[in-house]
């Protein structure tokens, strides 16, 4: 059998490289079953295992096969496996599992190559080229609150992971900047500030209060309500005075959002509901021409199989709604932005809405019938942020928690903990401030991202700022400690990278090396499943593997110092890339 040299296509991705080897083996072992995909998983009794034997046996046992059972199929897979520098040995376990042990020399060489060529050479390659991630999406004239936290940071992490995996990502902020509520806001603005051109953020003050006061007047004052309804008509009709007032409210709101995004290091391009207005009528017309739109109780609707209530696309008063805007946005993203994968990050409560409008899009022929081919749509639903009482997280006054206040408190608590440890005497005020911010915001993000997004989680500053266990604080400490070990060696790590060699002779060295090499497949899994907690789990276990390595293997002053310093550096690099993908700023000293 010819030797297959490790493929550069999947550098630093043993799982993918093994899949290529076993793909050859499968085609040689069972040439009559050409569509069988290699099933490669991390192994219980080896580094990896191939799980095809049992499935293959069930396919071929009635077809006059030479094999006598799954173990014989597994043995044949081993015999047909091309020789490769990455594989040390293979063996059969149980009912035909093929256990694979990687070559320690190959593992060491792969890590050395990453240290020279950079962590980006380990980035997975996905089959999709361009994706839209629709996330955050607050409503104009309302402040961002704790409910926006999850969409904002989950969406940002998904975008970062896809970008790292060589996907062009269009980060979209689908803000609520249109609708009947603007009539009441504009009319209230006119009453308070007859000269709207001179209105500033300072003059309006707290937008949340402004919104509440206008809503109260709308509910209690019939004359004001009528004016507000007329204002909506004028705004939608393009009246320049009303358009200007609307633009002013949007601008003030946008500036408030920008402050939060800057603090969280979130990049977004706004394409709000109003952006799609010019396209809605044509999209509804296209859906009507395909026979999808029907009249029902004065409204125009699409009936969706499996749902009792239809999807309303034109209200009985002739106005448009969320469904009309969302369908139009999807049409635009597919036809104008040429996106192959459109990902919506919202709470799980909106699941039915997405199910219905995705089915409507399939009915229209915009999307394929299955979820495996492109273009594809995905709803990334997430659970609630809960308080100690297991109910929706609120302030003591039963108010929604403002996101800006939450960020302030995270930073303040982080700073207080650092001062308690005397860091204000060691560091400059600027350093203290920067590190407090990195730790505080990092703790907030990680506590959210480490939870499977589908479930809710209980918000607790005490828990998330704990320096022990699965927290950002613990992980940032671990990274800072690795940096300290390298600094204390007195060696130029960049020079060592060029000439030094890694040996994975000790069991703890090898375990750490294997975990480092599982980084690319972890990012790929987190991207394809749209689950950031997969990456968080990897990062936490990486810090645990490093702790075991450091407890068992002396680094500085040992005979293996160069190799072990390079392992420290590789761990720090992978940790930093994980932090980057999670939107967390690493710290180099704590």
From Swiss-Prot:
Keywords: Acetylation, Aminoacyl-tRNA synthetase, ATP-binding, Cytoplasm, Ligase, Nucleotide-binding, Protein biosynthesis. SMART domains: Arg_tRNA_synt_N (SM01016), DALR_1 (SM00836). Transmembrane segments: none annotated. SUPFAM superfamilies: Anticodon-binding domain of a subclass of class I aminoacyl-tRNA synthetases, Arginyl-tRNA synthetase (ArgRS), N-terminal 'additional' domain, Nucleotidylyl transferase. Forms part of a macromolecular complex that catalyzes the attachment of specific amino acids to cognate tRNAs during protein synthesis. L-arginine binds at residues 137-139, 148, 322, 326, 350. Gene3D superfamilies: Arginyl tRNA synthetase N-terminal domain (3.30.1360.70), HUPs (3.40.50.620), Isoleucyl-tRNA Synthetase, Domain 1 (1.10.730.10). GO terms for cellular component: cytosol; mitochondrion. This is Arginine--tRNA ligase, cytoplasmic. GO terms for biological process: arginyl-tRNA aminoacylation; post-embryonic development; reproductive structure development. Its EC number is 6.1.1.19.
